[in-house]
């Protein structure tokens, strides 16, 4: 068995069966079953779902959507990613799989917006996301240039 990696998930019934393993593990708002079923019905080949397989089973997943800021009152201008529904099966939590998914998204080098769910604020803080509060609610943002500057400063020290 090779080292697990992040991959784009296919929109098919096998993935739908894999998603059923996550049902009941987390909060209802993390459920992706309906979203995946809608994509199967629409025959959408451009999957927004990413995951990590380990031992042939899906153990972690997230949704990534490319967006453009259309006047929303927050600090991202232009194109950015919305990271939704990051979830790792209980037996695989605290082993770096959630961080692998986020680092995959960071590697695309777009700003990222996400909403912290279920006591996960510390996770986003650890990954250099900044909290943002607006009248509609709170969320976290990561900027590629902030991360690149931090690496450059560390390398020069």
Curated annotation (Swiss-Prot):
GO molecular function: acyltransferase activity, transferring groups other than amino-acyl groups
Enzyme class label: transferase
Entry-linked Pfam families: Acetyltransf_1
UniProt keywords, alphabetically: Acyltransferase, Transferase
Protein name: Uncharacterized N-acetyltransferase BA_4060/GBAA_4060/BAS3772
Stretches assigned to the N-acetyltransferase domain: 9-146
Source species of the chain: Bacillus anthracis
InterPro entries documented for this protein: Acyl_CoA_acyltransferase, GNAT_dom, YlbP
NCBIfam families with a match to the protein in the record: PRK13688.1
Enzyme Commission number(s) from the entry: 2.3.1.-
Keyword Ion transport: no
Top-level taxonomy: Bacteria, Bacillati, Bacillota, Bacilli, Bacillales
Domain of life the protein comes from: Bacteria
Gene3D superfamilies with a match to the protein in the record: 3.40.630.30
């Amino acid at each position: 068995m090779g080292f697990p990696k992040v991959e784009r998930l296919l929109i098919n019934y096998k993935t739908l069966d894999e998603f059923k393993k996550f049902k009941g593990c987390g909060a209802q708002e993390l459920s992706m079953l309906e979203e995946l079923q809608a994509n199967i019905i629409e025959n959408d080949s451009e999957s927004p779902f990413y995951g990590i397989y380990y031992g042939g089973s899906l153990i972690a997943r997230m949704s990534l959507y490319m967006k453009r800021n259309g006047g929303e009152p927050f600090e991202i201008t232009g194109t950015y990613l919305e990271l939704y529904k990051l979830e790792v099966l209980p037996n695989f939590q605290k082993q770096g799989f959630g961080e692998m998914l986020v680092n995959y998204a960071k590697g695309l080098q777009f700003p990222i917006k996400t909403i912290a769910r279920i006591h996960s604020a510390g996770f986003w803080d650890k990954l250099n996301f900044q909290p943002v509060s607006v009248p509609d609610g709170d969320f976290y943002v990561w900027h590629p240039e902030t991360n690149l500057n931090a690496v450059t400063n560390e390398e020069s020290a």
